[in-house]
Amino acid sequence: MKRSAFNAIAVDTKEFQNSTKNLSDALAKAPGMKLRESGGVGSDMQLMLDGFSGKHVKIFIDGVPQEGVGSSFGLNNIPVNFADRIEVYKGVVPVGFGTDAIGGVINIVTNKKRRNWFLDGSYSYGSFNTHKSYVNFGQTFKNGFTYEINAFQNYSDNDYHVDAPVEDFETGRIDKDKRVRVKRFNDTYHNEAVIGKIGIVDKKWVDRLMLGFTYSHMYKEIQTGVRQEIVYGEKHRKGHSLMPSLEYNKRDLLIKGLNVALTANYNKNATANIDTASYKYNWLGDRKLMNSPGEQSNQYSRADNNNWNGTLTVNYRLAKIHMLTFNHVLNTFRRSNTSLLAKVESEDAIAKETHKNISGLSYRLMPSDNWNLSVFGKYYSLYVAGPMATTTNQDDYVRTTRNMNSIGYGAAGTYFILSGLQAKLSYEKAYRLPTIEEMFGDEDLEMGDISIKPESSDNLNFNLSYNRTFGRHSVYMEGGVIYRNTKDYIQRNIADLSGGKYAAKYINYGKVLTKGYTVSARYGFGNWVSIGGNFTKMDVRDNMKTSISSSAENLAYKERMPNLPYMFADSDVTFYWRDLGRKGNMLTVSYDNQYLHSFTYYSSRIGSNKGDYVVPDQFSHNISLSYSLQKGRYNVSLECRNFTDEKLYDNFSLQKAGRAFYGKLRVCFGN
């Protein structure tokens, strides 16, 4: 990745593997990256990358897109031991991923090195009755037969304290200026996942042929809605997922230099939303009988999702300096909804379905080790069918269909100015097709819009990096500037429903202009100490001169887009004491912090009550201690997160957990 012309970095997860961190925690260390969660373990999570967040950033595991795989495989639910490294591509995305991301790509790379046998297992326990466990074992025989099992689980009561306004049931009022310290009481989460693979490796006719099967299950209680004054006492959801998969790789197929990779999977998952309580709750756990059931909307429904995904990647290298890459991704999705409220199940008459095709072709020129250049083109196609409301109160629907087609293109180049000093420049005319959630919602707290349009963006990156070693001293510095001119920007807003209830909705927001920069640095002294940090500033502005719905002047023109952090930083220092107590043992002590500058989650031109909609400055601190024996075979770790007990917020001022303690035991055998 270092010599790649694309704005890309790799996060090595090895330093985190004795910690209780998940993949999203490890990613938060990347420059320009901000992790945004709505609560504790299992909560909704978004990754913000260089000013883009949520659906703008696409997730892959070993190059396979993770759309529609279910919440058990959210990055905040996967243990960090699952990955060997994490690749981050910003803005301009290589053809090989076959995706429509305009914000970037996160690629989780697992360890595929051939090993005779291995076992990696861990268990952790911590605050809020949090239990996490992970096991990965497998074996490769001399005849090439191989198998591997990955399994993990997360459980937490998530019963941490928050400061929230409490509704007075006698008056029916909520004093938003009066905050009471209360304990979350309907927020239990647990998920379990098992991934099994068997196959053949390192044969003349195939380098890797694997058949896999994945099962996952999740249960999630829902404590609050999109605002913290909303309280649920019994609302919850549950679901499961089944996914068979195929993976094929062959280098030098038929002719030298022709490499082919093929993946395919079918994901069938079902999610049930249960909201049938006859009581209304406040933050004290008090309740009162309602006139009709349903805390948000009276429902006991099941959404059955069927998702097919196939990818084909062909690389052809000619005369060492030329590389052609072709990639095609096919994705089909179908959802049917069934109401379970009645004694007889009733299924929606109109199913929701999509067919997405993305093709890409690139050429890479590599005349020397000092520079290389890539040019590429992409074709996007999306067919959508589903219900569209014919009345304003959305009580009548008709089936509608849409076709969307776009062509994108771009180029990327890199040049080593001096030894260790590298420059990168890249541009892409990028498109992002609407996601399933944006078009169809989640059948609960997210409202979809089937008529929403694709986003388009002109993405430009420029980066300089310097890497040098002086004896026992090592220095790495990197700086980058970005420019994004986005049209039909898809924005997540809050919809005010009847009866004081709220949901999220998606709209196209005309034009948005993003400019920003990131700076990162790291210093190491031998094998004893590592210290580094990142700083990010992103200016994401409303670039619409007129209102979306009329020709009237847009009062928010040139104002910052709401609910987007625009300045944040992090730093860390780690000390290593090797051969402590015995040769092969090591004590590691780490400290890290995160700073977030205040931002508004509504437009900054909202009038005199602007302070009510501000997420305040935040500065949190974490510390961890780990002791490894026999070259990492046995490991014990202790962590304290947010040890100064700061009040932390992310999405629409939803409060996260305060000070928390965790411990972890890990064993690792094999080669």
What are these regions (language model features)?
Residues V64-G91:
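Short acidic/polar hinge/loop motifs at secondary-structure boundaries
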Residues R115, S124, K142-Q228:
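Periplasmic-side early beta-strands and strand-to-turn transitions of outer-membrane beta-barrels
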Residues I195-M218, R237-Q394, V398-S419, S426-E428, ...:
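Face-selective signature of the C-terminal outer-membrane beta-barrel domain
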Residues Y431, N485-D488, I531, V589-S620, ...:
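C-terminal beta-signal and adjacent terminal beta-strands/loops
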